[in-house]
Amino acid sequence: METPSQRRATRSGAQASSTPLSPTRITRLQEKEDLQELNDRLAVYIDRVRSLETENAGLRLRITESEEVVSREVSGIKAAYEAELGDARKTLDSVAKERARLQLELSKVREEFKELKARNTKKEGDLLAAQARLKDLEALLNSKEAALSTALSEKRTLEGELHDLRGQVAKLEAALGEAKKQLQDEMLRRVDAENRLQTLKEELDFQKNIYSEELRETKRRHETRLVEIDNGKQREFESRLADALQELRAQHEDQVEQYKKELEKTYSAKLDNARQSAERNSNLVGAAHEELQQSRIRIDSLSAQLSQLQKQLAAKEAKLRDLEDSLARERDTSRRLLAEKEREMAEMRARMQQQLDEYQELLDIKLALDMEIHAYRKLLEGEEERLRLSPSPTSQRSRGRASSHSSQSQGGGSVTKKRKLESSESRSSFSQHARTSGRVAVEEVDEEGKFVRLRNKSNEDQSMGNWQIRRQNGDDPLMTYRFPPKFTLKAGQVVTIWASGAGATHSPPTDLVWKAQNTWGCGSSLRTALINSTGEEVAMRKLVRSLTMVEDNEDDDEDGEELLHHHRGSHCSGSGDPAEYNLRSRTVLCGTCGQPADKAAGGAGAQVGGSISSGSSASSVTVTRSFRSVGGSGGGSFGDNLVTRSYLLGNSSPRSQSSQNCSIM
């Protein structure tokens, strides 16, 4: 069974055999054949889309698996990190507590040392005074040898008195210790009484709050009841309530006053007892001190006490040195532990950052694939909806009549003048290709020539003294920017080199202004290279602009709407098929020579959009912006004017045919 296109071709052939064909009629026939060829290529395109959807499903599965692996690893690392951090905090807290304890002990030891040193100084003064008196006594002894017997008897008497005094001193010291103990007990009882007073005050406040709450509740209940009774009953209940509340207040105030009086009486009595005990103890201590001063005339006891104090002082100093050494060791141990924990935390952060970077790369790839698949689906749906085509392939048409189509179209200029230009579309796209072999990459190049941005993607600082940025704008002279001799780009940092005409502020090390150049330049081919101090190219980014112009025509004869693609400029002027649309790189390809149309289109049309691809030379992500200019009258739907009449869709592999008259070649 013949298709509608075959029937139209048969009818056209019969008419052509019976009547001579006009140039317009020949053009229509040739366009019908081209439309049939488009159907074949659309079928190939649909197969390609299906294969891409299959690949996308596999990639989605891989991305899902990668996300699950990354989430599990991040959760494990996070748990380990939190556990290690908790252990480090516990260790730090224990070290801080031990340090505080050692500092307290050190302060106590220092106070004891100061007290012992003062006592030692005082006893040394007493020793010197006693030695001077000993000399006087020896002189008296020499002058009073005659009264030796009397002195000996007095000596025995004095020795007895000394023994009695020592006993009294021991008793007084015991009494002093007991007085101190009583004073401490009194202070503890005082603190206890103050605590009880505070507790009673809090209980009083609590009782007040309870009574206030009960009062409010009682008022609320009475107010509820007063709604149902008359005014006389209401006044009676209010007076009763006021009397009851007044009695409650009086009772509570009496109890509070009684508690206060009892507490004050108890506190005053205990305070008076403590004061009396302190006074008695101070009197006893004064008497004891006087007796001790009298007893210090004995050199032997002073010497013994002095030697004992010196021994105690030496022991305290040794203990102090031991404590200082122990504190130093604890500090060193704490520093080592903290350094190890910080190093482990830095390693975990680095691993987490690496995994996040890998996940971000996978996510970027997924987003790019989703964008491309969405665009392909929209294009195919628009073509199928407008042309109502089935995916069944037809036989390929030879391209032998392409030249006749071109010549007859030119010869029938008088007929084509009847066509009205409905709409035209201009697409300007920027394709970027980057390559990096070192730590620093050219991250971004401004299309208007305002700035160039570099990024250090490594974990180490990069010295960039005397490095150069070389900018080549097509056939224009080479521009070279040289970094300062001591410039260093830190790890993960970004530096932007602004042209002086951009109006940026010089703020090293993140923003540098090239005062010698007003602009970095702009054009259809921009190549930016980073050269190190040895002259080696370590990074490069190339930006190429391509421009295509698409026109949408309408014929007024019996054949209706048909596709027509204009390949702007002189590209493939002699012969060739309509251009193919490469789905992967999103550039228009010549159907004859397979070269990008931007080389032939050059700078034709208006620049209104850009296509930006980032990453290495092996992959690119493209986003295209376009505008639409409408001329003439009439027009189709959005899908007819903007998408389906713009490009002839085919597979991603360009056709291989003769390229005799191709301007690209």
Curated annotation (Swiss-Prot):
Annotated crosslink Glycyl lysine isopeptide (Lys-Gly) (interchain with G-Cter in SUMO) location: 201
PROSITE patterns, sorted: IF_ROD_1 (PS00226), IF_ROD_2 (PS51842), LTD (PS51841)
Single GO molecular function: structural constituent of nuclear lamina
Record-annotated LTD domain positions: 428-545
Modified residues (N-acetylmethionine): 1
Matching SMART domains: Filament
Cross-link Glycyl lysine isopeptide (Lys-Gly) (interchain with G-Cter in SUMO1), sequence positions: 599
Biased composition annotated in UniProt, kind: Low complexity: 395-409
Disruption phenotype: Mutant mice survive postnatally for 6-8 weeks and show skeletal and cardiac myopathy, sarcopenia, osteopenia, decreased bone formation, neuropathy, abnormal neuromuscular junctions, decreased skeletal muscle growth and decreased muscle satellite cell proliferation. They develop ventricular dilation and cardiac dysfunction. Within 2-3 weeks they show a reduction in their growth rate and by week 4 their growth ceases with their mean body weight being half of that of the wild-type or the heterozygous littermates.
Region named Tail: 384-665
Residues with the N6-acetyllysine modification: 32, 78, 97, 108, 114, 123, 135, 144, 155, 171, 180, 201, 208, 233, 260, 265, 270, 311, 316, 341, 417, 420, 450, 457, 486
GO-annotated cellular components: lamin filament; nuclear envelope; nuclear lamina; nuclear matrix; nuclear membrane; nuclear speck; nucleoplasm; nucleus
Annotated stretches, region: Disordered: 1-25, 384-442, 553-577
Reported impact of residue 108 to R: Decreased acetylation by KAT8, leading to impaired nuclear architecture
Region feature (Head): 1-33
Positions of the record's site feature: Stutter: 325
Quaternary structure and interacting proteins, as annotated: Homodimer of lamin A and lamin C. Lamin dimers then assemble into dimeric head-to-tail polymers. Ultimately, two head-to-tail polymers assemble laterally into a protofilament with a uniformly shaped rod of 3.5 nm in diameter. Interacts with lamin-associated polypeptides IA, IB and TMPO-alpha, RB1 and with emerin. Proteolytically processed isoform A interacts with NARF. Interacts with SREBF1, SREBF2, SUN1, SUN2 and TMEM43. Interacts with TMEM201. Prelamin-A/C interacts with EMD. Interacts with DMPK; may regulate nuclear envelope stability. Interacts with MLIP.
Membership in a protein family: Belongs to the intermediate filament family.
Protein's recorded name: Prelamin-A/C
Organism: Mus musculus (Mouse)
Gene name of the record: Lmna
